[in-house]
From Swiss-Prot:
Family annotation (InterPro entries): Ribosomal_bL28, Ribosomal_bL28/bL31-like_sf, Ribosomal_bL28_bact-type, Ribosomal_bL28_sf
Key word Nucleotidyltransferase present: no
Gene3D superfamilies registered for this protein in UniProt: Ribosomal protein L28/L24 (2.30.170.40)
Keyword Ribosomal protein part of the UniProt annotation: yes
Lineage: Bacteria, Pseudomonadati, Pseudomonadota, Gammaproteobacteria, Enterobacterales
Listed name of the protein: Large ribosomal subunit protein bL28
A GO BP entry: translation
Keyword annotations from UniProtKB, A to Z: Ribonucleoprotein, Ribosomal protein
């Protein structure tokens, strides 16, 4: 399973570790992803999404129904 937020599209980015001597070694910054069950009142069922912490805030703001409508419009499965 890829490390991509289903709501915001956040994905890993690359950067450098920097030691005290400023030596650079490659590393990945991973999004703060969680599998979370959301209750969809209109469908009377739970939906499990892999979302970042920001994605959960978006769902709190817009509502799960609106977010699922956006996912359907993009053709994503959930």
């Amino acid at each position: 399973m890829s490390r991509v937020c289903q709501v915001t599209g956040k994905r890993p980015v690359t950067g450098n570790n920097r030691s005290h001597a400023l030596n650079a070694t490659k590393r990945r910054f991973l999004p703060n992803l969680h599998s979370h069950r959301f209750w969809v009142e209109g469908e009377k069922r739970f939906v499990t999404l892999r979302v970042s912490a920001k994605g959960m805030r978006v769902i709190d703001k817009k509502g799960i129904e609106a977010v699922l409508a956006d996912l359907r419009a993009r053709g994503e499965k959930y």
